[in-house]
Amino acid sequence: RTKISTYLTIPCGNQSLCVDRVVSDNTGRLSSVFVGGVYPLFRGASNRVLLAFASPQFQSSYLNSLELSEEEKTQLKEDLKGARARGYDITHNRLTEGLFAVGFPIYNSANQLVAGLSVGGVDDSERPDVVEKYIQQGRQLAVEINNQMGSNYYSRISD
């Protein structure tokens, strides 16, 4: 519907599982994310949003399990904090070189985090208007899905 690539992931232990994807013609050949694929939570927008909106206890345990430098862990913590404050995460070249994505949390009727939704396309840092379009379209999709799931998450936050 958005004519951009869309991915849906769910938490799967300390990783995420891609359960659905719709890829556009311009990103399909580049995408390294496939239905049934398992991915690290700290790479890719639909994965990182699962980590950003997870409980502080889970985040801490997960971050401590990563084999990253302290500097990388500190940067990741700041990125996750920013994503949570914005209500979405944005990544450039994190999971697939040449692509960017914007990830949004999906909640169920009990307002429990159940999935991550990302929309993305070819990375063009010279066109911030394109990124903003993806943010708006992704947010609209996330709101619709959350509403259909019975969640009031997006009615509780401001744009």
Where do the PLM segments sit?
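Amphipathic alpha-helical effector-binding/dimerization core
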Residues: 1-62
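Sparse recognition of residues in long alpha-helices and their boundaries
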Residues: 24, 35, 126-127, 153-154
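Alpha-helix boundary recognition
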Residues: 51, 64, 81-84
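A general structural signal marking secondary-structure boundaries and capping sites
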Residues: 54-57, 87, 149
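Short, hydrophobic secondary-structure boundary micro-motifs
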Residues: 61-63, 92, 154-155
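Short histidine-centered catalytic/ligand-binding loop motif
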Residues: 63-69
